[in-house]
Amino acid sequence: MDISADVDQIIAQAPDWTFAGDCALLALMKRISQNLEERGERTSRNLRDFETSVKQVDIALNNATTSLRSLQFGNQFVEYRVEEVDDADLAMPEEKKKKPELPLKSSEELAKEFLENNLRMFRKNYEPVTIEVPDSDDEDGPVHSTTVFRAKNPYDAIPLPYIIGTKEWQEHKYAGLYDSKENSEDDRSEEFSSSSSDEKEPETKKIATPANKLEEQHLSDSSSLASFAREPAIVSPVINPAVQVAEPVIRTQPRPIINSQRNPHERDMFAALRQSPPSDDPPSTSSSPTSSPAFRNPSSRLPIVSTASLSSSSSSPAQQPPRLFDEAVSTQTPKEAEIKPSQTKRMPVNLFNEDEFKSFMSEIVDKVQSKTPSSSVSPATTISTKEPPKTKKPVEEYPKPGPPKQIVEQTVPKRVNLFDDSPPLSPTPRSEPVFNNTKATGAIPKRSPVVVANNDEDNSLFGSSPAMPKENPSKKPPKPVTKSLFDDDLEDDDFLSSFTPKAKPPEQKLLSKPKPSLFDDDDLDIDDIFTKPSAQPKKLSERVAGKTSLFEDDDQDDVTDLFGSKKAKVIPKETSSGVSPNKNVETPVASKKSLFDDIEDEDLFGTPKAKNLIRSEPDNDPEAVGEDKKQSEIAEQKSKNIETGEKQHQVIAENASVPILRDSPPPMEVTEQKSDDKEWEAVKDDTSAANITKSKDLFSEDLTDDELFSSTSNNMAEPKSANETNEFNKPIEKYTSQTEENVSPVNPPTKLSIKPTDLFNEDFSDDDTFLSASMSKNEPLVGTENEDIKKPSEVQLVKEIKAEELPQQLPENKIYEITAVVEKDELVPEMLSKPQIDEPVSETPPPDDYQSNVDPIISMVADVTNKTSVDTLTPRKPADLAAAQQIMQNYSNLFSDEPPDDSEFFQTLGSSGLSSLSASKIFDNEHDFFEPALPNIPSATKPSPVTPGDQPSVSSDYGAMCLFSDVPPEDNDHAGEEVQKEAEPQKDELASTTRIHTIFYDDFSETARAGAVQPAPKRFPFDDEPPPADETDRSEVKETPELQKPTSPVKKLKMPNININVHALLPGSGSVPKLIRKQESSSSERDEPQATVQTEAEAPSSGQNTVSSADGVLQHVNKSRARGPAKRRPSTRRGRKENYAKSLLDAGQNEGPTASTRDSPEVEHSERSSIKAPSPQYVKPEKLFSTPAQQIQPQLQRPPPSNTGGSFLDSPDEDDSFFNSVPTKTVEGKQGTDPPKSYRSFLDSPDADDKLFSDLENNKAGINVVPVEKKPPKMANSFLASPDEDDFLFDSVKTNATTTAQKAFAAEIMNAFQKVTTAPPKPSNAKEAAKPKSQAAPKLFDDSDDDDDDLFARAPSIQTASKPVQAKQPPKPAATSLFSSDDEEAEVPVKSAPAKKLPVKPSKSLFSDDDDDDDLFGGSSTSKAAAAKKTKPAARTASKPPASKTTTPTATIPSNSGDNPLADLLDFK
């Protein structure tokens, strides 16, 4: 759009501006805007098209990933054929084309060919047998010899496979087909492989269809013919009829290749089956691309193969992956087809072995150990030549690599590639045999692009014996590409890349001394991931040279070796080639196994994890040197202590068996994870850990979740078992990580290193992934390519490696035992970390969530650091959150098959960063599900019952559990910790409340909290004695967060609870609770005060279980609590009914100052008893709840009537520290005697009430004394200062982890109290109501005491206003029943008849709020004013409390204040 001319014209008119200029300018502007709009639409349309195309590509890529993964994990059904299958059937179309040429032959030629074919068939299928028949009975008679042709038994040469499912079939890698004679087996294996490969090799079939046909015929001949010599002769004639002369040569060559390969495999290589099976397996898994290209290359490589027959035979399988590239290039299409059959033959063998037979792998490994050295030696010579081409290969990667690969791969590369292909198929778990790894790699070849890079890497891995050295340089370049490809493209690719990097390190180990620079360069050029893999290649080469040590590791512990090999990889990269060789020998197999561990075998996966843990330790040794240098900046002592401690600890801390595994295995996984992690890290530094976890998890999705969890839990436990590492990390991390964890989001490298270490050590929910990420990060540190990533990875590596060492070990029990011995506290986080492992389900979200989690985590870390004096908890909590969130997101993928909904839950929960929904609870619920964790919590009253993981620090680590556990660590820190905790739970609740399912999980967390709340009070009992002031401080600090918290619980109530609460609370008057809730919803302030009052009530309810259930809270929540507390409730209800009836009678008799005085001492006693009770509650909540709690609560509830005036005063006194207005209230409060008595209660209550609030609220949630009757004051106070009581309630509740549950109860309790509690005071209200009518001013205070009861019982006040006498009499029974119903309602059952009374009267009470307006003018105005105060404080945060304070002193003021509160109440309603 050219507007320059128009602009020039307009500018020219500027001096003489006219309306025409305006019009021109407007037109120009319109043109510009239209042009912008058009361009914007076009751009947006292009963007939409691009987005669509990206989505399409993503879907296609996901489909490819799914198919590849199904192949890798063996989920795809592969038919094992016992009968021979001719490739001719597959090649029919081409043969038909050729057939038209055949008819040209003359009849003579046809007849001759017919005879030849018949003779050939006859010779092939029949054998001459000479039978001597004596002419006569005479021995001397002439003997006539007759030659008979007897049909050959095709299975004379071809062995029948073992019966499927038999021990031999399971133990033998080739199911009994491979040990047979070479000729027959070659043919047979060819046929099998051809069938499997043809299925997957359409291209090769098409290309060399004629060759395949002839070849197939020959193959059938060879299989049928007893002697292999016949086959070649037969083959040549067959070739002539085939008409393809070029292919006959190829065919002849393929057979020699087959012979060289097959024979070596059968003879030398059969001893080293690991190599040959890998070649077989890759074809089976990815038959066409890998198998055909491999053979194509072998045909071209035959001369090289001849140079080293063993190496060629072993290498030909390895070369197959390169042929994938070759196949893309399709340099030798006819040869490919012919060579395919040979590979195909191998493939079926692998198919039989597949990943299923670890025992086979170990046996084969033993065999290979004996024979691989020779094969490795011969390939080494060829490899040196091939190495440069391989280097080229990585660069060219797909099309170009083809020709170089042919040259390079002629001998060794095949084997290496096959191995590389195999490891993805059978993840490292199969450390025992290398061929298992090769099998795993076989699956990988299907990903042709990935396979290319992987093949290069794999070449180093599998060719390590033959071609490790030369592949080192070349593989390093390919790895970066593959990793980037894998990282970008597929998680599977990431797996492959992780495996491939491992392959590289082995070569490097062979070349480690000559090519140390290669490691450094590769590390720098490519991510450290690649450098570590390069170390592995050295290990492989060493393995080839000294397979004994490698296989010894395999023989001892295949899994261990896998990790050990990884260790070796990591070590050579990082520090000294000298060290790496030692571990390299151990690790070579291990590296592949670790690959398999991640991908294929669930069982293997479980063990590999343990091995990964081990690996991490060895990684620490070599990497420790590099890491120590870098970490020394962060924490020199940490890394050194951890490294030394880990090395020693690995062996010592773990079981005797573990140490061996640790020494060798950890490096393998470290390299794998590093490779994956590095890839991810390159993309997503901080999130790399999460991503890595995802990729591994993705591969392990097929794996059993239990195994994953167990392995992760093991990881968690083991880092702790290596307490030296954890302890060293923790003390340092406690300081650094607490400070740095807060900063960690900003500086992920350094602070993440410390923090992730704790995170990973403490939270191994993503142990494998995080460990891998940390490992990869550490490697990058060595590489220095990504310094940012490296920095965090260093610390993380040290910590994660420690974590990995322990976590990867399969024996979870051992790990737990070790951790238990080392640090019982750590075990709990480990348990929690298990759930976390499950959590990070979402593959992509975890990185973002991880970073986003870092912020909540940081805030939580800050809170935790303040909260938990135990520093270990601090690192764990952020780590748990990040890990749990990532894991929850990844968890969906891991368990996507089984619980996609849950995974979504976890993802959402993880993203929300809810502490209450933290992995520990979710997973505890999943594993333990409902009863195991919940009953334990209430019964023991400690977090430990929830789950061993939840017990110590882990519970504190998790937001929901932290409320429990954080309090336990230290009472002194409790106030600050609770404040932080409150903020965290608020965030969590806000995030979680929107989702019903999150609420559902919150309810579980609430039940856990309810159980844990009681334990929290223990601390308060400790705090209760010294710090009433401290508690007030806590409340002050927490006031704002507390207000927020109540709202979130209200939301939860609203979400699923509203209906349930209404019905449960008020079967008769469901409308009343709804109104109350509407009010709550209408004003968050009121909701908060109600929540605070309710939380106070709930605190007692949680302590006594009666109140909580009485609210008619969600039944499922109550059920969860009922599991533990169910035993308590019945006794509590009855005890409460009886005690409260007595208290009502006493209160009714003692309405005057005596009642108030008695109430105040009772309050003190109740407080003291409650204080005493909390400790018993911790020990046995049932006892306290059954009797002491019941008695205390009635007493407390009784005293409050007297204290009501006092309770307002009391709350001020408690608020005293906050408001300092208590003395004025007390002076004004109850004119003469009442104020002193109220003073007693207040003076006592500040101390005792603080204890009550700390002990009762925390322990028993305040045992109703303060909470129930002080609710109105607390409401007012809480609104003014988010009342001390509320703060205490929230502190105690939060610390007790009742925040959500109690909050949910809070709204309900508010309803119940406003209804039920109003009913209970009715007797006193009825008696006093008559008096208040006559004596408004003096008894306002007395009544305010009783009226506070009236406040709780608004209905009675109404009744009293209308019928004072009757109200007195009926209300008492009603009150008892009502209150008992209150207790009952507090308990889940609303069934009790009194509950019905409640609804009726509470409904009146709701109406009574309106009636209270009249009553305010009437004699019971004081009680109504008090009731107004109760609700009104919610409405008026600041203004109301003074009004309430003033109202108590004078009758006139209460009426006025009553009017205002009523107006507020009406407004709310």
Curated annotation (Swiss-Prot):
Keywords, comma-separated and alphabetical: Phosphoprotein
Coiled coil ranges: none
Motif (LFa 5): 550-563
Disordered: annotated segments: 178-349, 367-546, 571-591, 607-760, 933-1254, 1316-1469
Cellular compartments per GO CC: cytosol; early endosome; nucleoplasm; WASH complex
Listed Acidic residues bias regions: 519-528
GO molecular function, a single term: retromer complex binding
Compositional bias of kind Basic and acidic residues: 197-206, 387-399, 626-649, 671-687, 971-990, 1031-1042, 1077-1089, 1159-1170
Positions where Phosphothreonine occurs in the chain: 587, 693
Name under which the protein is recorded: WASH complex subunit 2
Gene: FAM21
